[in-house]
Amino acid sequence: MIFDVKAPILGFETIHKMHLQKIDEIFLRLNSAEDNSVVSFTLVNPFALRKYEFEVPTPLKILLELEGAKSVLVANIMVVQTPIELSTVNYLAPLIFNLDKQLMGQVVLDSKKYPHYHLRENILSHTHE
């Protein structure tokens, strides 16, 4: 599914279209959908790994047309390592997808408001919660 990027991924502000592909119930692949770009991210379903909740800022709700949206997906960027147990997840800057309207964006959470989320957390750090 191709998404219009309404709130860019930090460091990738020039990418305006992304292709999201589900791998399984936990992992997804996000690739640039533009001819001049070869950007790819591995994403993870945070709810499969830990208790995870945050408030979406109003400006992002408006940009992504989340009011009344029936299908919203939250995913986090993962840095894959070998072995997989060394991989890290960015819980402080989730990606939000409006599946109904094919809109997406990244929100950077306030670390003071969410001190229990970090930019690089080991993928296994919350598996026993």
Swiss-Prot record:
Does the record's keyword annotation contain Manganese?
A: no
Mind telling me which Pfam families this protein's record contains?
Answer: FliW
**UniProt cross-references to InterPro entries, sorted A to Z:** Flagellar_assembly_factor_FliW, Flagellar_assmbl_FliW_dom_sf
Keyword set, alphabetical order: Bacterial flagellum biogenesis, Chaperone, Cytoplasm, Translation regulation
Q: Which GO terms describe its cellular component?
A: cytoplasm
Location within or outside the cell: Cytoplasm
Signal peptide coordinates: none
Q: What is its main location?
A: cytoplasm
Q: State any GO BP term from the record.
A: bacterial-type flagellum assembly
Give the superkingdom in one word. Bacteria
Residue ranges annotated as transmembrane are none
What's this chain's function? Acts as an anti-CsrA protein, binds CsrA and prevents it from repressing translation of its target genes, one of which is flagellin. Binds to flagellin and participates in the assembly of the flagellum.
Q: How does it assemble?
A: Interacts with translational regulator CsrA and flagellin(s).
The record, for HAMAP family, names:
FliW (MF_01185)
Q: Belongs to which family?
A: Belongs to the FliW family.
Protein name according to UniProt: Flagellar assembly factor FliW 2
What organism does the UniProt record list as the source?
Helicobacter pylori (strain J99 / ATCC 700824) (Campylobacter pylori J99)
- Organismal lineage: Bacteria, Pseudomonadati, Campylobacterota, Epsilonproteobacteria, Campylobacterales
Q: Which gene encodes it?
A: fliW2
